[in-house]
UniProtKB/Swiss-Prot annotation:
Annotated source species: Psychromonas ingrahamii (strain DSM 17664 / CCUG 51855 / 37)
Protein name according to UniProt: UPF0276 protein Ping_0944
The family this protein is said to belong to: Belongs to the UPF0276 family.
Any Pfam family: MbnB_TglH_ChrH
Gene3D superfamilies: Divalent-metal-dependent TIM barrel enzymes
C-alpha cells in the first residue's frame, strides 16, 4: 500500500483518463475507483489499474454492496471485494447508505432507505457482516435524496451517527449530497453538519449537480456531470475552516467526463482552499 498524506486531495479514476494518467503522471494525492469495475482479473480495467497503482495511493468506493437491504450481503460480492482489497491494499474502502438488490436481483441505482429503528438494525447487521468479512473498517456515505419516507423516526444525520456508533465504521461525507438534499427538502445545511459526528469523517466528496424542473419547482440531481458549484465550494471552505479535519478530499466526475485537465483544475482548487486556510490560521 502506497502511503498517503493526511488531508490530501485526489480525483476519481475513470476509464477515459487511464492512458493520459500513465503518460503524464500528474501530482495527485490519491485516486479513487469504483470497486466493482475491477473485480474481473482479466479485464482492461484491471490491466490499467495494476499499472496506475504503482504510482498513486488508491481508495475503493463501492456502489453494489447494498448494505441497506433487508437481506444479507451477497457472499460472492464480499469475496470479490476482499480479493481486490488484498491485492491493491487501498487506503480507504467505502460504500453507500442505500440498497440496490433484492432476491438476487440487482438494480443499477442507489435506492433510499427509511430512517427507522428497523432499517437501522438491518443496516448495522449488514455493515458488521461486511467489516467482519473484510477484516477492516469501511466508510459509509450520506446519500443524495429526492424523496422522504413518512415513517422515518429520526433525521438523516442522527441515523448516520447511530450507524457509526453501533458499528465503529467511518464516515464519507459528501458535501454535494448534503447540499442537493437540503435544497430538495428545504432543510439547513448548517444544522445537518452540526449534528454529524465530525470525529468520524475520514473522507469528503465534492461533485457537480444538475437542475430539473418538477411540478413547477426546481430539483437538484446528483449527476456528477458538471463542475462543482460555487455553493458547494463555499460549504467546503466553511467546513474545512471550522472543523479542522485531516479527512481526505475527493473530486468526483462520472458522467459527461471531460479531459483530465478539468479534473486537475478542480483538484487544485480544493488544494488552494486548504492552503489559504492554513495561511489564515498562521496569521491568527
Amino acid at each position: 500500500m502506497k502511503k498517503i498524506q493526511a488531508g490530501t486531495v485526489g480525483i476519481g479514476l475513470r476509464h477515459p483518463h487511464y492512458q493520459t494518467l500513465l503518460d503524464q503522471l500528474p501530482t495527485l494525492g490519491f485516486l479513487e475507483v469504483h470497486s466493482e469495475n475491477y473485480f474481473n482479473p482479466h479485464s482492461q480495467n484491471r490491466f490499467y489499474l495494476e499499472q496506475i497503482a504503482a504510482h498513486y495511493p488508491l481508495s475503493f468506493h463501492g456502489i453494489g454492496l447494498s448494505i441497506g437491504s433487508s437481506e444479507d450481503i451477497s457472499k460472492t460480492h464480499l469475496q470479490n471485494l476482499k480479493q481486490i482489497i488484498d491485492i491493491f491494499q487501498p487506503v480507504l474502502v467505502s460504500d453507500h447508505i442505500s440498497w440496490s438488490s433484492l432476491q438476487s436481483n440487482f438494480f443499477n441505482d442507489l435506492l433510499p432507505i427509511p430512517y427507522t429503528k428497523k432499517a437501522l438494525s438491518c443496516f448495522v447487521n449488514n455493515l458488521n457482516q461486511t467489516q467482519e468479512h473484510l477484516q477492516r473498517q469501511i466508510l459509509i456515505e450520506n446519500p443524495s435524496s429526492y424523496l422522504e419516507y413518512n415513517d422515518s423516526e429520526m433525521s438523516e444525520p442522527e441515523f448516520i451517527n447511530e450507524i457509526v456508533k453501533q458499528t465503529g465504521c467511518g464516515l464519507l461525507l459528501d458535501l454535494n449530497n448534503v447540499y442537493v438534499s437540503a435544497t430538495n427538502h428545504q432543510f439547513s445545511v448548517e444544522k445537518y453538519l452540526d449534528i454529524i459526528d465530525h470525529t468520524t469523517v475520514q473522507e469528503i466528496h465534492l461533485a457537480g449537480f444538475t437542475q430539473k424542473q418538477v411540478n413547477n419547482s426546481t430539483m437538484l440531481i446528483d449527476t456528477h456531470s458538471t463542475l462543482i458549484s460555487q455553493s458547494v465550494w463555499d460549504i467546503y471552505q466553511t467546513y474545512m475552516s471550522t472543523k479542522k479535519t485531516d479527512a481526505l478530499t475527493l473530486i468526483e466526475w462520472d458522467l459527461d467526463i471531460p479531459k483530465l485537465g478539468t479534473l486537475i483544475e478542480e483538484h487544485n482548487k480544493a488544494i488552494n482552499i486548504k492552503q489559504s486556510l492554513c495561511t489564515s490560521d498562521k496569521h491568527v
